Amino acid sequence: MSVRILVVDDDRAVRESLRRSLSFNGYTVELAHDGVEALEMIASDRPDALVLDVMMPRLDGLEVCRQLRSTGDDLPILVLTARDSVSERVAGLDAGADDYLPKPFALEELLARMRALLRRTKLEDDEAADSVAMTFSDLSLDPVTREVTRGARRISLTRTEFALLEMLIANPRRVLTRSRILEEVWGFDFPTSGNALEVYVGYLRRKTEAEGEPRLIHTVRGVGYVLRETPP
């Protein structure tokens, strides 16, 4: 059975372009023109993934993310943001989106990101049952319940943030190269240009240091990142 993707965008040309491209690549595609219609369709027949524009009438993409996440729905979500709007990307990740893609975008990149997102989702399902909670310092991550805590404080992470932190905590005090992280978290076909990794590391730091806790995720300049108690 093919993967079902719901594309939500108020621009008909964008919807049709994505429908053609995704269908050609073997996906079953459904379309919605705004957030209200999208939530109704998800409630009646849940898709496997969601491609979601941010700026839409009636109900925007950020509110769709928030409403889905508030009910505990972990539907994989790729949001489409304005090209130069850093604040929009920030808001999308904070609302619970798993990944973002700035407009205008190459269809090849959207397909690559969707493949990577679906791979991460499948790996979660396949591996969670065999996993045990992992800890480093006062940071704890449970792959089964998907709970993350720093001390007594619970931390809410998106799917991509969780996958990145899981990789770091599974390799404590070991420097992970940028290319290795991109390959394992995003997939081999993820475009290595751009600053997606840096964006996600920034968000992990913000969330894990929200109450003034010492930094655990450190940059190794020119190489990658490492999880350790003190800077390298």
Curated annotation (Swiss-Prot):
SUPFAM superfamilies: CheY-like. It is found in: Cytoplasm. Residues 4-118 form the Response regulatory domain. Its main location: cytoplasm. Keywords: Cytoplasm, DNA-binding, Phosphoprotein, Stress response, Transcription, Transcription regulation, Two-component regulatory system, Virulence. The modification 4-aspartylphosphate is found at D48. Residues 131-229 bind DNA. Phosphorylated and dephosphorylated by MprB. Member of the two-component regulatory system MprB/MprA which contributes to maintaining a balance among several systems involved in stress resistance and is required for establishment and maintenance of persistent infection in the host. Functions as a transcriptional regulator that recognizes a 19-bp nucleotide motif comprizing two loosely conserved 8-bp direct DNA-binding motif repeats separated by a 3-bp spacer region. PANTHER family: REGULATOR OF RPOS. This is Response regulator MprA. It comes from Mycobacterium ulcerans (strain Agy99). The gene is mprA.
